Amino acid sequence: MKLKIDCIRKRHCYCHCLVSNVYKSNFKFFRIGMAYAKVLRRIREQKTNYNRRKSMLMGHRDFITVQISNENTQVQVIHPELTGDKVISSAHSRFLIEKGWKGSRKNIPAAYLTGYFAGKKALANGTNSAILYSGTRQYTQRMAAALKGIIDAGLEIPADEETFPSSDRINGEHLKIKNDVKNIKSSIDTGAKSK
C-alpha cells in the first residue's frame, strides 16, 4: 500500500506502477488511471498487424499470404470483403507428393512450386494482380520463392527482383535429395490447360 501511495505522490504514469509490481495487488484502478491497458486479442496472439492490414486494405486489391509450417507450405490468394476475407485460390505443398516430390515440402523449391500452382489456380479464377501481405511474419527467402512462383505463373505483383532467391536455389541444386522442378512445373501447366 505504501508503494501505491508513493507512486501517486510522484505522479508517475501507470507504466511505473506496473514495473513496481503494484498490479499484482487487489487494486485495479489508480487515481492516475487504469493499471491495465487492454490489448486486442489478435495482437496479443500475434495473428494480425493492424497497421499493415489497414495500409493493405486501402489499396482495394487482392492479396497473397504465404504460411510455412513445420512440414508444409500454403499459399492463398484472398479477396478482402466486409463480411470477411474470401479465398480465391489456395495451394498446399501436399500436392507435390502426387507429382513425385521427394524430401521436404517447406524448402525453397517446394515453396516456389506451391506458389506457381496457386498462381495458375488464381488465373483460372479470374485474378490478374495482387499484392503480398506478410502480416506479422517476416519476409524470408521461402516467402520470396513462393512470390516468384506466383509471378512466373502470370500474376502481376509489385516486387523487387533482387529479393528473390537465385535460380540454382529455386531448382534445388543445393539439396541432397534431387527433384526435377521443371518436370513438375510442366505437369502443373498441363493440368491447368486441361481444366
Where are these regions (language model features)?
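Generic short N-terminal amphipathic or hydrophobic helices
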Residues: 4-7, 31
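Ribosome-associated RNA-binding proteins
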Residues: 23, 27-195
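Cysteine-centered motifs
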Residues: 7, 13-17
